[in-house]
Amino acid sequence: MSASYEPNERRAYAASLSRFRYDDGNDRSTLNLSADQRLLSRPYFLLNGLANLYTSRSSRDDAPYFNPSRDASLELGLRADHLAWRDYDNHFRHRLSVNAGRYWQEGYGSAWIPSLSYRHEWQWAMGRVLSYGVSWARPVYDGARETRYGFDAELRWGE
């Protein structure tokens, strides 16, 4: 179940509550709250502050997959959005997001978790958008820090 509220283009809030029932008898519940607040608006540049709070719990801590009995995180970040080129319905923009926060897992304590992402967005007609990006993060699982690199792409076709 999820809900979002955007009172205007400068502010947005979202909340989600999920329950997962696995075949092995594990029940996992999660709660996620997020906020996005515009800090600076210029004709071709936007700067937003980001906040995210997450917590989860599971009924089984001996599962053969990553499944903490309880965990939580709080992240704060900034997203810079630059509209580099625009011609009527066509544009190119790029975005840089920088986040840092604290992750806690029962039995393993807490650790800082940084992340970065950089994206391009090309729109060549109304509703026709190609977006792609790279990301880097240093999450912690069962007390061990890992490095995660990512690439994703999205093609939107329609209004």
Model-based region annotation:
Residues 145-159:
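Outer-membrane beta-barrel "beta-signal"
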Residues 3, 13-17, 47-51, 76, ...:
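Membrane-embedded beta-strand positions of outer-membrane beta-barrel proteins
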Residues 32-39, 43-57, 65-82, 90-93:
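Gram-negative (and chloroplast) outer-membrane scaffold detector with strong preference
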Residues 5-10, 38-48, 84-93, 123-129, ...:
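Short loop/turn motifs that connect adjacent beta-strands in outer-membrane beta-barrel proteins
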Residues 1-2, 16, 30-34, 64, ...:
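Membrane-embedded beta-strand positions in outer-membrane beta-barrel channels/transporters
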Residues 7-9, 17-23, 37-39, 51-59, ...:
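Transmembrane beta-strands of outer-membrane beta-barrel pores
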Residues 79-105, 109-125:
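Structured C-terminal portions of repeat-based eukaryotic scaffold domains
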